[in-house]
Amino acid sequence: GAPARADGVQAGLPDAAASLLTAESAAASAVNADLAPLGATAVTPLDRAHTQADLVAARGGDLTKARPYVGPRPGIVTRRGWGADESLRERNFAYTRTVKAAFVHHSATGNNYRCSQVPSVLRSIYRYHVKSSGWRDFGYNFAVDKCGNIYEGRAGGVAKAVLGAHTLGFNSNSMGIAVLGTFTSAGPPKAAVTAVAKLTAWKLGLFGANPRGKTYLKSGGGNLYRKGSNVRLNVISGHRDGFATECPGRLLYKKLGTARSVAARLQGR
């Protein structure tokens, strides 16, 4: 289906979320102030030329004459758009130095949801991460649904290097993207793979990363690499590349090559 418009997503919100902004809601929205008005339910897409111009301006114009390799900014449903209860998370935002890599996950939840139900799915995952796992906030930096919609995950600003909780040992200098569903025996929808490519083309591009490239991340300690080891990884990796796990499912993992190629093309490489 076509990506849900922000107002379509808004319709599924609880009454409380549609009320005036609380201090926590305002803070979660203000970190996206360069991209969307305060209280916006979505960040609107921007074409590649304007995305490049914004990036050059943000860096004070101190780039080489070459235009930056960055994909067009995709539309992103904000936390307000999916009805995140901002009182659940820790109040302060946590950041990391840069974004050198993206780890792709599956949420290991059901595949039979309707895209109009996604705000409710995200609220459940959020509550689980905070209440059951004891994390400071939603673990993933972004979520993607089967219709190709992209959602803001952990609060702190969609264009910023927000520290997530997604790949034990490699949360620093990376981002985590959860594709909603389970892709062990079912293939991911094409729209979801394309959305991963669009999101990474933009977000990795903001930090100068090539989606088809390799990078080094220092392990913080996990079940695959000992703490302190420098690990060479694809810039777009699966969860299993940094941690011994089935995630993101065999059939989504097989599509990461497609996501890398499309993302690089969207960056103009």
PLM features per residue range, with description:
Residues R136-D137:
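Carboxylate/His-rich catalytic cores and anion/metal-binding grooves
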Residues L88, R97-S132:
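Active-site acidic/histidine clusters and adjacent loop/turn architecture
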Residues P3-T96, A101-F103, S107, K146-A161, ...:
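Basic/polar, cationic surfaces and motifs that engage anionic cell-wall
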